[in-house]
Swiss-Prot record:
Protein tyrosine phosphatase which stimulates progression from G1 into S phase during mitosis. May play a role in the development and maintenance of differentiating epithelial tissues. This is Protein tyrosine phosphatase type IVA 1. The lineage of its organism: Eukaryota, Metazoa, Chordata, Craniata, Vertebrata. Substrate binds at residue 110. The active site is at residues 72, 104. Farnesylated. Farnesylation is required for membrane targeting. Phosphate binds at residues 105-110. A lipid is attached at residue 170 (S-farnesyl cysteine). Residues 8-161 form the Tyrosine-protein phosphatase domain. The modification Cysteine methyl ester is found at residue 170. GO terms for molecular function: protein tyrosine phosphatase activity.
Amino acid sequence: MARMNRPAPVEVTYKNMRFLITHNPTNATLNKFIEELKKYGVTTIVRVCEATYDTALVEKEGIHVLDWPFDDGAPPSNQIVDGWLSLVKIKFREEPGCCIAVHCVAGLGRAPVLVALALIEGGMKYEDAVQFIRQKRRGAFNSKQLLYLEKYRPKMRLRFKDSNGHRNNCCIQ
């Protein structure tokens, strides 16, 4: 069986947020996948596709796996968006410098959409978020996902406080 040529995992960093966008491993490639996760300091994986591997090995390495699948090519449900943004806010506040991995099948649609939502909620314009991710992950997003991101209205849930306890709401006029 021919192996699909999969893009390498890419790290997306913005403000205090670090994400790793990747494709899904199989049980056969799981050890290499875990090595990659550890290299980037991943503590949580969000799996947005159907399960293709047993999470026991990953969990044994201290990496928490969350299953939030949604249909390929489609936008995430409001419930998934709410869970994702809550996770991002809590993880980066409680574990500064940590990295959240997100994967779908190829790492080109569903996973980049969630990362783009975090960037938009962090203050980036939708066009900039798309371009920022596409610079690292060529071919990311289909037209339906782009339309979803364009229409998405941020709730500004990812405003973090600085070390003095002040909200980081900087605005350039």
